[in-house]
Structure formats: C-alpha cells, structure tokens
C-alpha cells in the first residue's frame, strides 16, 4: 500500500494541527482510497488521488497525489508526485510497503536467504514497534556481514527495518545461491 499523508501510527490514532485534533489511522488514508486513472501511454500508467471533503476532515490540506508505474523489461519504476493545491504549507510523509515472495518458487523454508543492503557494509539501524503499530527508537542495530543479513525464523517478528536517510540506496533479496532475484532501488 501507499502510506500517505502519514507513515506510521500517530499516538492514540490522532494528531494536532493549529490547535485542533484530527483523527488519523496508521499510515494515513491513501491506502484505503480509490485512485483515478490519470494517464496511460505505452508502458506507463499514472493514477491520481485528489483531496475531498472526507480527506479534509482528517487532513486539513488540499492536495493531489500522483503515482506512476513504468514497465521496462523486467523492471518496474514507481514515481510519486505530491501537489499542494492549498494556499498554505502542507506537511506530509509518504512511503510504501512493497511485498515480495520469499522464499521463491514456493519453497517453505527461508533458511539461507539473505538481504543485501547496497553499499552499507556493517550495520543497519532499526526500530521496535509498540503493539498499536508505533515505531519506537531503540539502540538496536542489525549487524551485517559484508553488507548482508541472513533471514532467520522470526527475522521480521519484533521490529521494522527502516532504510532512512542515506544509509543505502538499494536492498536486494538473495536466494540460497547468493543471487539477487529482487532489488529495490530508491533515491
């Protein structure tokens, strides 16, 4: 799903802006809304979500959120563009929760699969989660060996691995032979 205008869960499912309290569920509302087809040409397609009175009641800003997908051989590029159509500064965050089959080929056991974190070689900072979905800062770090982490049972159970700032520009899932079968690049 697309996470907009919030990434994460606000405390008590609400936030304050200019002295007023607004309701907001985990990761905002875009993931629960229907986007309109904006354009389709060749191997590209664009969708748009425009603010409504319903969104304005939760998020007091007028906007247009454009999401484009382009297919090029075995690669899919995703592009986000946010237009502030209001007359005031607009505060937002945007993110995604892509999901990939692991292990590949319907195998049952993830043992031996790894994650490679691009040019990051030693460790990745990560966050814990509260039961209601809020990310909490921890001092924990995922130790990497030559930029890789072994996926073990329970690897994703207790925390969220967030790639933030300039920690790395790509993450790959490696099969048991060490071959990347999915790579996500971002900038």
Label the predicted regions.
Residues 44-48, 66-68, 77-81, 114-116, ...:
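Beta-strand secondary-structure signal
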Residues 102, 106-187:
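Active-site/ligand-binding surface loops and adjacent short beta/alpha elements
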Residues 20-73:
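Extended, loop-rich substrate-binding clefts of extracytoplasmic carbohydrate-active enzymes
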Residues 16, 38-39, 70, 83, ...:
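Well-ordered beta-strand positions
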Residues 14, 21, 44, 75-77, ...:
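Structural motif
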Residues 51-98, 104:
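Acidic, contiguous internal or C-terminal segments within carbohydrate-active enzymes
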Residues 11, 33, 65-67, 169, ...:
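Residue-level marker for the onset of beta-strands and adjacent loop->beta junctions
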Residues 1-21:
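Acidic-aromatic substrate-binding/catalytic surfaces of carbohydrate-active enzymes
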């Amino acid at each position: 799903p697309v996470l907009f205008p919030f990434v994460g869960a606000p405390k008590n499912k609400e936030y304050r802006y200019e002295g007023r309290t607004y309701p907001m569920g985990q990761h905002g509302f875009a993931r629960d809304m229907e986007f309109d087809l904006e354009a389709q040409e060749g191997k590209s397609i664009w969708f748009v979500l425009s603010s409504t009175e319903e969104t304005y009641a939760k998020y007091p800003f007028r906007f247009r959120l454009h999401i484009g997908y382009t297919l090029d051989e075995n690669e899919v590029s995703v592009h986000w563009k946010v237009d502030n159509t209001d007359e005031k500064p607009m505060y937002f965050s945007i993110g995604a929760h892509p999901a990939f089959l692991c292990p590949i080929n319907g195998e049952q056991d993830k043992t031996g699969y790894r994650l490679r974190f691009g040019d990051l070689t030693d460790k990745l900072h990560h966050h814990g989660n509260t039961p209601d979905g809020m990310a909490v800062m921890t001092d924990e770090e995922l130790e990497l060996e030559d930029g890789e982490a072994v996926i073990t049972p329970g690897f994703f159970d207790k925390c969220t691995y967030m790639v933030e700032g300039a920690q790395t520009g790509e993450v790959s899932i490696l099969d048991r032979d060490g071959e990347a079968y999915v790579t996500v690049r971002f900038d």
